[in-house]
Each structure stands twice: as structure tokens, then as C-alpha cells.
Amino acid sequence: MMMKGCFGEVGVCVVLLVCCWGQEVTAQPALTYHNHVHVRSFEIDYEHSQFLKDGQPYRYVSGSIHYFRVLAADWPDRLWKLRMAGFNAVQTVIEWATHEPRQGEYLFSGNNDLEEFIKTAQRLGLDVILRIGPYICAERDMGGMPYWLLKLHPDIRLRTSDPAFLRHMDRWLGEVLLPRIRSLLYENGGPVIMVQLENEYGCLVKLCDRHYTKHLRDLTREKLGPRVVLFTTDNPIPDHLMEGKIPGVYATIDFGVGKDPKEMFKMQRLFEPRGPLDNSEYHSGWMDHWGLHHHTVDSKVLAEGLDAILALNASVNMFMFHGGTSFGLTSGSNILPKFRANPTSYDYDAPVSEAGDPTDKYLPIRDVVSKYLPVPQGPIPRPTKKGVYGAVNLTAIASLWEVAARLPTTYHPWPLTFEQLDLSVGLVIYSTRVPFRIPDPARLSLPNVHDRGYVFVGGRDAGMVSREQGMMDVAVRATQGDTITVVVESQGRISAGSHINDFKGLTTNATLNGHVLKGWNMTAVPLTNTSILPDAPWSPRHLPATPGTPSGGLTFYSGVFTVPDEDPHPLNTFLRVNGWSKGVAWVNRFCLGRYWPEVGPQVTLYVPWSILKRGQNELLLLELESAPCPAPLPCAATLQDKHVLDGPTPT
């Protein structure tokens, strides 16, 4: 049991004033009546196997919304839809890489304003459950940890007591994140009731490091105080729970549809004989991967499973309630058992779609929750109107070669990784010369390319290498003195398991007919840095740029579309790139993410209303492989009102 009482640097207790719906909620000094002080508290009642909130039995029904997958302008809308479904809490993970993309540079404003997200939830009457990591998985690049850990320490053992890892983790959590969270804890007047440490750590089984997890526990207790409820989550498998359990931290489980909740909770009871039953990840859908079919879960099955969990008086978090989007190039990848990258969309077949619309799951879920918790009165959320902004004519404005020519080049005898070149995501152009006479054809071997490479010899297209397809060799025709160029794309670092030290680029030496190639010039192309993007010359007399390849690949294309001035505000819309192959899209210099309709299942990209403006807007594509029209004819893309996430796939 957690102790009750006052604490804090100023020695006062705090209490949440009861406010009307939608009103700002702030921390206030506790009021004293006849020498009685009301102290806000949230704790575990082990004797009666329940949570207590201010001394009263409590169970949470929460939904996962990742603030970094939703633009800040839409946080109130998504959280309101969660509350109107009867949920009383929101769960979110906190991504280290979002807030410290470069070592020592911290971002906590705008779309990264974590504290504002938490306060918005509080204003809407939602409690908050935080998952602080430092590893979060969530199908994010490197599981949400920053790439520069690999840059600084190539041999670092992530998620362990490796001193290098602990040093950076301690600074991030102990000096930056946790002090920001403390004032938002429930006992301090905020909405944060629980904090999760790590994520499914037990799935590593024999790789688990108890010194690390105890260190994480102690650091969190030191910075947040002794009374905050800490918890872990693991698969309901004995080995996973045994390895993931941290002494003094409450162990919860996660499972989706098709599982018997009674049997699953028996697993939790093996490690928590007393305390609340808690499924902290009840899956509403599942993740997608490029080239594999789109995952869905039947709404009736999902609702019945939720009902069965709640009937046991368990607490539950629905993962995801609203999935959102991995904007930019932040999506991760997995080994299944071969490499597979996650798409830009994180729709997850959730009750609220990527664009913020209630799906066919919303009302059945709401009906189930209403049996156990009061559902707020008010209008039931409805789908919003979408923009049909039509065809966008796109003209080639620069080749990748032109853009790269303005960027610095690094020379080294051996090929360097993205991390060694201080590049998080994007492209690296590797070039070397053939120093000797070779047979015709010769075999160029690029073992362990991470992840996809476009090969050129003497300026001519010579083929492709692919980690996903296990294609690491190319037969080339070259003469002594020819330049070999390889453009390597990162498709997202592995987000789970023992392979998250996922270096990108040419990660081992390249050979030509068995001879190691030396002397490399390398140009890092940081596609998330808008300052490197080419400007569009809007003069109608401007001639299209020469494409980077004869097929129109490795080329930037730009065009404009109009949002009518008479519209009160822009509308959500979806970018369709029929005929285009693979690349990256920006609207008004905001990076929507990767597109790859050739392999599916994601065909369209979500374009949020808040990045648009009335009048002219710019669409920019970097096509990596082939455009749907021969130069110099203009190509086109379309902005439509339908999202397509279940397109055809090769397998």
C-alpha cells in the first residue's frame, strides 16, 4: 500500500477542484475543513485487488493515442472522441527521439509539446497513463530511441546496464523528462496516475538485464517520488513475465482478441497474486508492413473481447484507440523473419481512423463501456468532410544529383554508415572508382546493405540491391576508372527484439569480383531538413529539370493546388500517387512520409488540414525509382476524399 500524506518542495498538498465539462483544470492548494486535509492520491489496494483514487475504488478504461503521431491542432479533437466513447483515461508513450533528435537539443514545443497534450487530456476529464521508455517499440525507428546513441557508441548495448547507455538515459530521464512530469502527477494536481517502465522487456528473455531495470526503477522513484504507481507490461507468457518483472513495480499483461481473458489473467496472477487485473495493451488492430496485406479486426469480436475483460472488473487500455501517422521518416521496421518496413500510416484499424473519423468500431466499443462507466452526454462524434482538391500537375524541378552537389562530401577509405555520417534518416550517396581491370560482367557485392540501394556504373543504371529481398549482388559492366555509385535509402530502423542496433547504409565493405573497393566519397542527404529541398521555379517558361534517371527516378517533382478561399478552413484530404513508384512526399514543406503504392497495402497518404492554407499550396515529391510519365511531360498526383490502406500487395 502506498503511504498517504503531503509532500513536495513547498510542503503543500494539492487537490483537483471539481469543474464543469471542458473547463480548465489546475492544481490548487488543498483546503482544510475542521483540521481535515484532503490529499489527492492514486494507489494500489492489494488487499482488495483494485486501484484506489482518492481512497475510492477505481478502474481505468483507457485508449492509446500517441501525441507525436497527431498534429497538435488535432489533440483536442482526438481526446474528445476518446472521452465521448466513455473512456476515462488516455495512455501515451513518450518518444526519446522526438524530443532529443540530436544530442543535447531538446524539443518540447508545438507538435512536441508533451505537457500541453497532458493538460488537454485533463481539461477533457481524462486521466493520463504515461509510458516513459526509454524504449517504446511502437513500430518507430529504433523503438523510439535516438540514432545518435549508435553514432557515439557503435558497440553500445541498448536497453542494458552498459555504462554508456545508462549515462545518456540518466540525463534524458533524470535531468530532462521526469522533472517535467512530476508536477503533472495526480498527487500534485495533474492527471498522470500511472507510469510504465520500459516495454515488454521480458520478450528479450535471456538477454534481460535486471541491473538495468532496477536502475530505471530507482531513477524514476527518485525523480517522481515514492508514491507514483509504476508498472510494466509483458506478454502473458511465464518466461516473459518472469524476466520483465521488476521488484516493487506492478506487473501487467497485454493481449488482443481471440484470447480468453480468464486464462490470460491467470498468467498475471502467477506474478501478482493480489492487485488489480490489468491488460495494458488490448489490441484494436495490428501493425502493417509494406508488401504485406492490411490487418483488420472485426468490430463485433473486438467489442465482445472488451466486454469479457471488463466483466472481470479488470482495467484495460485499448491499443490503439487512434493510431495516427508516422509523419516524416519515423516509422520503423521488423524482422519477420526477414526485414520488413512499416508504412507511413499507423491507422491500426482503430476505433478512430487515421484522419480522426469514428469507424465501425466506435459505437460498439462505446456501448460496451457504457455498461461499466458513465458515458458523457453530448453529440456522438461523426466523420468530417474531406477535401477533394483534384489533380496536381507535377514538373521535375531538380535531380537528386543536383541537390547533392550543394551538400558536403566526406571521404574515407571505407564506406561509412548513416550513423558515422551523423545522419538519422534519408539517403546516402556512396561513390568510388574501379581501380583495376575486371571481367565483363563482374559481380558487385554489397553485403548487408541497409536497406535499399540504387547502383550506377559510369552514370548508367546498373540495378538494385535490397535487404528485404535478400538481393545483395549486381552483375555490372565496368572498365578501369569508371565510377560506381550506390544511393542507399534507410527504410526505418528495427523497432523490436535483439536487432535494434540497426546501422544504416553500406554496413560492410563492398567487393568487385572479390576485391575490396576502397576510397569512398559519401554525401548524406537529410530529407527531413527542409533547407536542402529544391525551390520550385513557378515561371511558366521554366523548362523541366533533367531527371536523375531515364525512368524519372531520383528526381524532385513539384506542383501547386488550391484550397478555395471561400472555405472556412482547409479540410483533411488524401494524396494518391497512382503510377508513381516509391518515394517521399511533402506538402508546404511538411514531410508527410514515404509512399510506395507499387507494393501496398498503403496507397494514399493522409494530409492533415492544419498543414494546408487557403489559396495556393505546394506538393513536392522525391521519386526514387520511376515516374508515370516520360520527361519533359508533366506528371500528376491527386488529392481525394478517400483513404486507401488495403491496396494490392505482392504477397
How would you describe each model-predicted region?
Residues 5-27:
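Cleavable N-terminal signal peptides of Sec/SRP-targeted secreted and luminal proteins
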Residues 33-35, 39-73, 80-84, 105, ...:
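Extended substrate-binding grooves/exosites of carbohydrate-active enzymes
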Residues 66-84, 103-123, 211, 438-444, ...:
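Aromatic- and glycine-enriched glycan-recognition loops and surfaces
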Residues 75-143, 147, 217-228:
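Aromatic-lined substrate-binding rim segments of carbohydrate-active enzymes
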Residues 90-97, 131-140, 193-198, 234-236, ...:
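Short, solvent-exposed turn/loop segments enriched in Gly/Ser/Thr/Pro and often Arg
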Residues 166-181, 188-197, 202-204, 209-213, ...:
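Carbohydrate-binding surfaces of carbohydrate-active enzymes
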Residues 189-274:
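Gly/Pro-rich turn-and-neighbor structural signature
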Residues 440-456, 484, 561-588, 595-596, ...:
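Aromatic-lined ligand-binding clefts that engage carbohydrates, nucleic acids, or primary amines
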